[in-house]
Amino acid sequence: MAASRNSLQNSVPTRVAAFLAKRTTPGEKVCVGLSGGCDSVVLLHVLTVLGPREHLRAVHVHHGLSENADRWADFCTDYCRRLGVELLVERVDVERRSGLGLEAAARAVRYGVFSRSAGDLLLLGHHQGDQAETLLFNLLRGTGIAGAAAIPVDRLQGRMRILRPLLDVARREIEAYARDCQLVWIDDESN
């Protein structure tokens, strides 16, 4: 059992390290979008395990849409303090009458915060399950071939590159890594 636990702990960091080695260069300012959920908690933990990154920080966007939003921000603040990672908590107002659905409006505001504060690279914790879910949703909406691309692993938004190092990792592997490393996370009731 210990051997399989060690291989799980090594698998996620090894895959993230290989992903970043292909797509990043030393000295780039790296920011993690930290919701406090399992995926982003693991991603930030892995980055600290891989070694010191002088330009590593996290951003938590406080949408205020849940009665738990303050607790989530406090959790992220405490987590980053324990890891020794700088954290920016940005409180935002989501325009509910924007013509977008609430989730799409929140996403637009969130990416606005990221583009102002992320630096060179924004790393997000989307995983295989998110990819499959997005693909299915897009196909059901009738997006055709364009929707089959689902979530891009690497894309440019303005001057910021958005990378998703966990996109080929299964949710169960991420959760197993978190349990093996005794990480805690928050569960968003809307997710």
Kindly give the residue locations of the regions a language model identified.
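Core alpha/beta nucleotide-donor-binding catalytic domains of modification enzymes
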Residues: 2-191
